[in-house]
Amino acid sequence: MRIAILSFDGFNELDSFVALSLLNRVPGWHAMICAPDATVTSMNGVMISAGIRLDTLPDMDAVIVGSGVRTRQLAADAALMARLRLDPSRQLIGAQCSGALLLTTLGLLETVPVCTDATSRPWVEAAGVRVIEAPFHASANIATAGGCMAAHYLAAWMIARGAGEAQARTVIDYVAPVGEKEATVERIMSVVSPFLRA
């Protein structure tokens, strides 16, 4: 499984790096930071090299659209949005927080409930979609998560969809706090599991 973690200048480190780390713990999976340019700088000044560029998006098996401080400007950039070629008929697609605004702009969230963070909610609602007060929601191959600490829900859903629920539990168990492993796995999977059976 090849996965793009779509990150733009001003990206939120939690959204991009938590997903990157969790997804790469699945044997045979390769999650990479995807950006428009060779380097991308986070909202807190962390500069990293992009593993892949936007032109590779159609070749990915899955894509996570992260959030950041410039999302509204990105959504208004028609030329950039035209470069984001996603196909929910064959790709697993997830959006974290304000990343939902980009999926909305692409017309991918028109008929499904959407999760996003409190700051992004007015922008996403203004774009014409229904935002719900929940950390995670998925419909078919598209999922959204709201709140930086909801990144693990998005990753767990993607792992469960692509490699099975047992693998998702294994990955979450590995990174869960000591003394809280069982409770953490059960909490995360209780949120994600209903959307695996829908």
Predicted regions, residues:
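Extended, subdomain-level signal for the structured scaffold at the beginning of enzyme domains
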Residues: 1-93, 100-105, 122-123, 127-133, ...
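Small/polar loops that bind or transfer phosphate-bearing groups
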Residues: 7, 116, 146
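Positions that flank functional sites
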Residues: 38-39, 118, 139
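Conserved beta-strand segments that form the floor/walls of ligand-binding pockets within enzyme
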Residues: 64, 115, 137
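Structural detector of well-ordered beta-strand residues that form the stable sheet scaffold
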Residues: 93-94, 115, 132, 143
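Short hydrophobic/aromatic-enriched beta-strand-loop microsegments
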Residues: 110-118, 131-134
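Amphipathic alpha-helical segments enriched in hydrophobic/aromatic residues interleaved with Lys/Arg
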Residues: 133-144, 148
